[in-house]
């Protein structure tokens, strides 16, 4: 068995799918750790081609020999909720100003998509997390 590589950094970024390029914010974040930026961009764009238009969070592990690995996460719950509600952005004041609504079925679908990244044991708990995000954005959840 090969010896384990030492991790030098863990970088978390949110990048448009298929649109990673060396320009800021990606270039400086990776360049400061000595990562070959173009290698990362090519690999990321190849893996996210089928998800164009979505923001895909990525967790990049940089090793001391300047090599890297990365793990793609599911899109942010807020982005999925905005898409489901058909709105551009959430509200500034969620208590008084509601900007849209989603159904329980849509919330369940989003929770199923996000389940691997949520800290919930079952789908019902995942739905509660997504409903809380919706409320904080000024989106009402209807039956």
Swiss-Prot record:
The keyword Ribosomal protein applies. One or more lysine residues are methylated. InterPro entries: Ribosomal_uL11, Ribosomal_uL11_bac-typ, Ribosomal_uL11_C, Ribosomal_uL11_C_sf, Ribosomal_uL11_CS, Ribosomal_uL11_N, Ribosomal_uL11_N_sf. Keywords: Methylation, Ribonucleoprotein, Ribosomal protein, RNA-binding, rRNA-binding. SMART domains: RL11 (SM00649). One of its GO terms (molecular function) is large ribosomal subunit rRNA binding. One of its GO terms (cellular component) is cytosolic large ribosomal subunit. SUPFAM superfamilies: Ribosomal L11/L12e N-terminal domain, Ribosomal protein L11, C-terminal domain. Pfam families: Ribosomal_L11, Ribosomal_L11_N. Signal peptide: none annotated. HAMAP family: Ribosomal_uL11. Forms part of the ribosomal stalk which helps the ribosome interact with GTP-bound translation factors. Belongs to the universal ribosomal protein uL11 family. Part of the ribosomal stalk of the 50S ribosomal subunit. Interacts with L10 and the large rRNA to form the base of the stalk. L10 forms an elongated spine to which L12 dimers bind in a sequential fashion forming a multimeric L10(L12)X complex. This is Large ribosomal subunit protein uL11. The gene is rplK.
């Amino acid at each position: 068995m090969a010896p384990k590589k030492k991790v030098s950094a863990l970088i978390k970024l949110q990048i448009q799918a298929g649109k990673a390029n060396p320009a800021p914010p990606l270039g400086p974040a990776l360049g400061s750790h000595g990562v070959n930026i173009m290698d990362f961009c090519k690999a990321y764009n190849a893996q996210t081609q089928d998800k164009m238009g979505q923001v895909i969070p990525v967790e990049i592990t940089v090793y001391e020999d300047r090599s890297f690995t990365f793990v793609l996460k599911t899109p942010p719950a807020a982005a999925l909720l905005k898409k489901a509600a058909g709105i551009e952005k959430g509200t500034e004041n969620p208590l008084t100003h509601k900007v849209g609504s989603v159904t329980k079925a849509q919330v369940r679908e989003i929770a199923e998509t996000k389940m691997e990244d949520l800290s919930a044991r079952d789908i019902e708990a995942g739905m509660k997390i997504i409903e809380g995000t919706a409320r904080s954005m000024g989106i009402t959840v209807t039956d």
